[in-house]
Amino acid sequence: MIRTVTRPRQWQRWVYSSCLLQRAVPPAAARQQPRFTTSHKANHFGYHQPIAPVTHAPITREDDFVLRSVFDYPQFWQDFTSVPGGIPVGLFRNSFLKEPRGMLTFAYVSLKKARAVVAKVLAASSVTEYRLIVRDLDRLSDILCRVLDMADFVRVTHPDPEIQQNASKAWESVYEYMNELNTMTGLHDQLATAMANPDVTVVWSEEEKTVAEVLKLDFTKSAVSLPQKYRDRFVQLSSEISAVGSAFVQEMAPEQETVVLPSSDLRGMDPVRARDLTRRGKVYLPTLSGEAVMALRTVHDADARKHIFYASRTASRRSVQMLEYLMRLRSELASLSGFESYGHLALRDRMMAKSPEAVDQFLRALVESNRPKAMQEMAELLAEKQKAYPQTNSLDPWDKDYYSDIIRRPLRVAGRQGDLLSSYFSLGVPLVGETWHPDVRRLDVVSDTDGHVAVLYCDLFTRPNKSPNPAHFTLRCSREIFASEMEEVWEQTQQSNQKSMFGSPELAATDGMTFSRHGDSIKQLPTIALVCDFPQPSKHGDQPALLSFLQLETLFHEMGHAIHSVLARTSFQTVAGTRCATDLAELPSTLMEFFAADAAVLGQFARHHETNEPLPYRMVAQKARQTRRFEALDTENQIVTAMFDQALHSPRAGEPGFDPTAIFHALQRTHSCAPPDPPGTSWPGFFGHLSGYGSVYYSYLFDRVLAQRVWDVVFKAGERRAALSRENGEKLKQSLLKWGGARDPWKCLAEALDDDRLAEGGEEAMALVGSWGSTKPR
């Protein structure tokens, strides 16, 4: 019933024209380090009082200059925040988070609130009370997710170990209670009673009805309707699946930890890297390492590459056994819940595909549309091999990376200027917003029509012990809070020792965090965090943080998720922001990668950090051509992997003799143009995505196809500056992005793409999407 927002990449004018402070006509002189001061105070705990957000968004040259400089130059930021003033507040403005144990207090108070809501739902008996059940259950979910989502973020990103530890404890206590609720028959029965009464449902909005169906499905997946002993087994299985999945990823290992070869066999590899691995004339190459990947691309000796390939594609027997055990556990869980397979269980809820059969239609159509290009690329690789071996008529599995690297090499040389792209992408240029502190820059997102609409925290720079993986975290979803709830929370506050924490019912109902007013109700604003690992700007202030083109794409990708969270400000948090169909969640972020490479978009911000010269677009075009080389073969590999994921979560997982490795090899032979893995290898033991993305791996491909289609249809593939058209952006916003999970995603797509064939979804629609293909023309 209750779930956290999971997503284990700068605003564009088409989203909010006012959120992008557009560059005025650039001055001829180079950019200089600015000096600017304003009122701001930071305290020792890292929490701060930002300057008051504006309710409008003027687009001025001075604002553009200031906002870029806040990110580009450390000295500017020190001046910007050095003037005393303001009252220290909690982290994210949460009034509980003013000291290290604050997260524990927040969890305790939230659990108390949650229990009160549970009691209210269980006691409902009148039509009036039943009419409020969906809103009450959504509020219950929000109370718990406020803690879970925030604690999850803090425990993996905050630099203070004590705060991390307390966040972990808070998360564990609330997560345990959430699992109790998900199998609570009373809540399920009360919801079912409400949904079955026409006098109740007649007053529900369409969004409310959607939320009710989502909650009902969540209860069904938790086996809440089963007898007690089966519910107990369900909880036991769920716990074991979680533990085995984590162990599978953490303990993943190759059968052979190190490949030992004579140093003479590694001709072609970077001699410095090879020398570092050499002892007494032998090279000791770690099997799962960057050096092994490099060797497969560069070592001339085919036998040496063969040894490395076998080792890097053969997981340990224990890893494979853990995979098999995980699949059997999931199969049992699905059977216990009344589903034919785990795939049927996983795809029924919050998925566009709805069934394994529909996914199969998509993947089969996609592999067919991709095959001609993949075969062409294989022919190019074979022709390259035949230059050295004229008599050969086939490629070995360890040839693909080697010969594709040879073909790419001239592109890399021609695009050597691509290494200079970072000179045009300083971090302060793409981002817009208001304030920050040393670890987190706080940005207020302001709309020219709706005022203050979201809060965005950017933790973008590298630091010791920080995760290198880019991520988007939803710390709090949008939700509408009515006067009756505010009065209730305010009364509870007055009766407790929290009386002095909040100055109004609105602040008490939002834990002191940011909200917007809508008549008699308020909306808690989406609060989002973006985490990256970009290089720091120069401490001397002479050079801003410079991004490679890949890092720029990453930033745009993660901001795509943030855009979705900002636009989908629904009344119910259950369907807010990225809480949409799982196989739609990557569409906005993947789409943003097209904007990152668009000439008109780059022209808005990409200038040399020293000379202020605009970016020569040919440099980006060269980089894009290099990246897309052999794209079809890469896509084919992902298709086969997605098919493998579906097969693992099919009824076959519960059959005797279930053999994941044999299934994988058979799929390669049937659907791949590339040579299949040889017998004796066991790559499935390395398929770590199975832990968190079981049965939904196809989503990456699905959203890539959809993103390409949206770019081509809605934004006219960027022709005639269509990427900067507000009209185009408004269409995507109104048809798809603003709904979150509150509307049938197929109807959203049909409206966005002006294609009625998609409106009803199903297997035919999935096959149609697959037929569009996912590779871009070169």
UniProtKB/Swiss-Prot annotation:
EC numbers, comma separated: 3.4.24.59
Cofactor(s) annotated in UniProt: Zn(2+)
GO molecular function: metal ion binding; metalloendopeptidase activity
Enzyme class label: hydrolase
Cofactor note: Binds 1 zinc ion.
Recorded catalytic activity of this chain's protein: Release of an N-terminal octapeptide as second stage of processing of some proteins imported into the mitochondrion
Keyword Hydrolase attached: yes
Pfam (any one): Peptidase_M3
Binding site for Zn(2+): 557, 561, 564
Primary role: Cleaves proteins, imported into the mitochondrion, to their mature size. While most mitochondrial precursor proteins are processed to the mature form in one step by mitochondrial processing peptidase (MPP), the sequential cleavage by MIP of an octapeptide after initial processing by MPP is a required step for a subgroup of nuclear-encoded precursor proteins destined for the matrix or the inner membrane.
Listed name of the protein: Mitochondrial intermediate peptidase
Organism for this UniProt entry: Chaetomium globosum (strain ATCC 6205 / CBS 148.51 / DSM 1962 / NBRC 6347 / NRRL 1970)
Lineage of source species: Eukaryota, Fungi, Dikarya, Ascomycota, Pezizomycotina
Gene giving rise to this polypeptide: OCT1
